[in-house]
């Protein structure tokens, strides 16, 4: 079955940010009543969709939100090691025409699926990330940009034989790759890097100059023209390569610093011919290329990656399929406290006597004369036939020990001998994010790497 996922970042995320910003200014801290103190990734919902191959998109009306919280099966703590900023994965592929970075254009325009419309950076086979500074006037990229691993520095420029110019930005951390790298996304390291005008590049440096019009009648050579870079910065220098009596390329020898804009003119020494060449300088972001990869690559996604390890010490049933994954913030224990444990079973456990027949996943069970007049109703998340334990979700009414609990579909009848409510107060906390998925079948010996990508 295809792994179809449809997600929703709820308005909680926005209101929490607004309150956090308010309290940061007012009290000097980012704390607000909605601010994250304890966040958990949960799995839930055993009911089949009308079409399991095409689950419906989640909505956030209150009926749905409450239903999601009532159908939680288990929740696992999210720590800082479970989170990482990610950007769209763009692998270098030969024969592709890449866009190139232009400081005078918005590089982060997106399509209806929120994917970049300008593919101006790539990842190579060594997980090095480069920005394209020139695409040979719309030519195909046929030479992979690569720097010797272990010798990379942000801002290193490559001019390749296919006419492309690249500048090195960063390398994907091997430790992050295991949990935060997939077919669509790749991780970026969170550190102290930021757009910093006190760095050598200052407000910006000139890393490339691209020839848009080659001109004519120039004298072949590298010292037969004068390249002048003007702007509000200082120190940038370059020379032109001339052959076939045209400007073929302009090579930057000194990038200078503190440029917010620049222009280039090509003139000739007295007595030399040539005219009409036009060239456009490319000015870096504040601090220089590679000084702040998260902002330079337009990162607006946060991946949450949590692994469920089998039964998690008996906390999570393994004989189930789940169809929802999400994040709940600040749920409460039945005591009213904020939970701090790593893993919680959020189902009620009903221990029953030995007998015949098996309860069915997804069926309703009840106590009373019939389902319509029942004093207690629950939905079967899992039936542990080896230990005679029902895992129940979405319970209603008051459970009574010593009374029969009857399967509305299976007709199975056993007597309840012990009933343990979930430690988590069902319905508590804020639903931050939820995904409706095609069913994911758990197994006793299997692990699930659950990844959620939040878009801001």
Task: Give the location of each predicted region.
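Extended assembly-interface regions of large multimeric machines
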Residues: 1-140, 149-187, 320-351, 356-358, ...
């Amino acid at each position: 079955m295809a792994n179809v996922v449809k997600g929703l970042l709820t308005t909680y995320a926005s209101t929490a940010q607004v309150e956090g910003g308010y309290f940061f200014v007012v009290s000097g801290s980012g704390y607000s009543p909605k601010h994250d103190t304890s966040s958990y990734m949960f799995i839930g919902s055993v009911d089949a969709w009308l079409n399991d191959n095409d689950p419906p998109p989640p909505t956030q009306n209150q009926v749905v939100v409450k239903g999601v919280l009532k159908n939680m099966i288990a929740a696992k703590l999210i720590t800082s090691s479970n989170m990482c900023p990610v950007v769209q994965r763009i692998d270098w592929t030969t024969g592709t025409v890449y866009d190139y970075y232009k400081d005078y254009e918005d590089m982060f325009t997106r399509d209806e699926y929120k994917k970049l419309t300008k593919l101006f950076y790539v990842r190579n086979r060594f997980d090095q990330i480069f920005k394209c500074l020139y695409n040979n006037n719309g030519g195909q990229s046929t030479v992979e940009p690569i720097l010797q691993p272990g010798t990379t520095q942000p801002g290193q420029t490559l001019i390749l034989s296919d006419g492309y110019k690249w500048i090195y930005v960063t390398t994907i951390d091997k430790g992050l790759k295991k949990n935060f790298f997939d077919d669509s996304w790749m991780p970026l390291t969170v550190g102290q890097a930021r757009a910093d005008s006190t760095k050598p590049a200052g407000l910006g440096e000139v890393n490339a100059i691209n020839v848009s019009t080659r001109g004519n009648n120039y004298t072949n050579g590298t010292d037969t023209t004068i390249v002048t870079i003007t702007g509000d910065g200082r120190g940038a220098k370059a020379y032109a390569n001339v052959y076939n009596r045209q400007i073929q390329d302009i090579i930057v020898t000194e990038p200078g610093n503190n440029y917010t804009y620049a222009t280039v003119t090509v003139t000739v020494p007295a007595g030399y011919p040539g005219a009409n060449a036009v060239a456009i300088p490319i000015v870096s972001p504040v601090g220089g290329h590679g000084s702040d990869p998260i902002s330079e690559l337009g990162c607006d996604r946060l991946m949450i990656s949590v692994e469920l390890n089998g039964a998690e010490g008996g906390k999570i049933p393994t004989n189930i399929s789940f169809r929802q994954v999400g994040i709940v913030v600040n749920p409460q224990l039945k005591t009213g406290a904020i939970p701090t444990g790593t893993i919680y079973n959020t189902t009620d456990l009903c221990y029953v006597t030995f007998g015949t027949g098996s309860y069915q996943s997804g069926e309703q069970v009840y106590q009373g004369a019939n389902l319509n007049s029942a004093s207690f109703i629950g939905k079967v998340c899992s039936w542990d036939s080896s230990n005679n334990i029902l895992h129940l979700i979405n319970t209603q009414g008051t459970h009574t020990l010593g009374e029969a609990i009857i399967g509305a579909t299976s007709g199975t009848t056993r007597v309840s001998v012990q009933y343990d409510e979930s430690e988590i107060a069902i319905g508590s906390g804020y639903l931050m994010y939820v995904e409706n998925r095609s069913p994911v079948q758990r197994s006793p010996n299997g692990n699930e790497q659950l990844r959620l990508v939040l878009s801001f």
